[in-house]
A protein has these predicted regions:
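Bacterial N-terminal signal peptides that target proteins for export
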Residues: 1-9
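Structured catalytic-domain cores with a bias toward divalent-metal coordination
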Residues: 26-316
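Sec/Tat signal peptide C-region and signal peptidase I cleavage site
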Residues: 21-25
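Bacterial N-terminal signal peptides
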Residues: 9-19
Length: 316
């Protein structure tokens, strides 16, 4: 048989495809591809650019969980969400991991969704905190769009699709629980750019009189790698002390050894906490220092869920 140049190119393409290994409609493990409706992926097929899934592979292999990818573009930004849903107890909290460089937060989310149900939405950025376009970058936690409002200062553009795709996993009446890790210590002058900051989430910071953050330190803090960086954020449009239910929640956290930062939201900054306040959603942010290996974050999750289930959460 005479092999023409065209035939040779075709044969090479077939051989290259075969060498690449089997593929499915969901794409290979190395390619983030939108998961089809009603399809659940095994852990080894869930796109994992930085080892989060690999590190939690055994737990994520539970038959109770359904793993998916949500892949979409909005403006110039391409987004990949890892969706982890508890099929047996879907009507639970929405666990949000906005930053892909915060490994402990992802691990805690897997623990939480298995124990308490609901759905995890984790932003997958190959281990990067930001979604980048050249020299510009978007912090996922400054990309929550309140309907009818314009672009916030730290947004590259308005983000209704990002917000809709993430928040659609929230069941009515359930809380939004953000999971984060943070740098040890803090900046004397607040620095919003995390890449320049020495830390901005701590208890015991000397704050300006007009600060929108009020500290409620615990008398006997729980065991943690860095106790002053181990805390819970709550948020409200009302000043501290003006919302009885939220005040009781803060007091109960303090009694359980958990520091609390109370954010008085006067102006929307497109963070998840501000979005939740504007939408009147129950919201908690659970923070530990980077690399905490004491289990402090999962213990705080247990405390928060105990209070919520007993009617002592941030909202009734």
């Amino acid at each position: 048989m005479r092999i023409t140049r065209h035939t040779a190119i075709g044969l090479l393409a077939v051989l290259a495809f075969a060498a690449a290994g089997p593929a499915t409609a969901q794409g290979r493990a190395g390619e983030p591809v939108q998961t089809k409706p009603d399809v659940c992926l095994p852990p080894e097929r869930l796109f994992d650019g930085d080892g989060d899934v690999t590190r939690n592979r055994k737990a994520l292999g539970s038959r109770d969980l359904c793993l998916r990818l949500d892949v979409f573009s909005e403006g110039q930004l391409r987004w990949v969400f890892q969706i982890i849903q508890n099929k047996k107890h879907a009507a639970g909290p929405l666990w949000v991991v906005p930053h892909d460089d915060e490994d402990v937060a992802f691990d805690s989310a897997v623990y939480a969704v298995l124990r308490y149900g609901g759905t995890v939405v984790a932003v997958e950025r190959n281990g990067d905190r930001y979604n980048r376009i050249g020299k510009r970058k978007q912090d996922p936690n400054r990309n929550f769009q309140v309907r009818g409002e314009g672009k916030c200062r730290l947004q590259l553009a308005r983000s209704p699709q990002f917000t809709r795709n993430l928040m659609r996993w929230l069941h009515k009446g359930q809380p939004v629980i953000a999971l984060h890790t943070n740098k040890a210590g803090y900046d004397l002058v607040p620095e919003p750019d995390e890449e320049k900051s020495k830390g901005n989430v701590s208890i015991g910071i000397e704050r300006a009189e007009d600060s929108h953050i009020t500290e409620f330190p615990a008398a006997r803090p729980i065991r943690a790698k860095s106790p002053n960086d181990t805390l819970i954020y709550v948020a409200s449009r009302q000043k501290p002390g003006n919302v009885a239910q939220l005040s009781r929640f803060v007091a109960a956290l303090n009694q359980s050894g958990i520091h609390v930062l109370y954010e008085h939201v006067a102006r929307n900054d497109c963070s998840l906490s501000n979005y939740a306040v504007w939408r009147n959603l129950p919201y908690v942010n659970i923070e530990v220092v980077d690399g905490d290996d004491t289990g402090a974050q999962t213990r705080m999750i247990d405390t928060v869920m105990r209070l919520i289930r007993s009617g002592q959460g941030p909202q009734r």
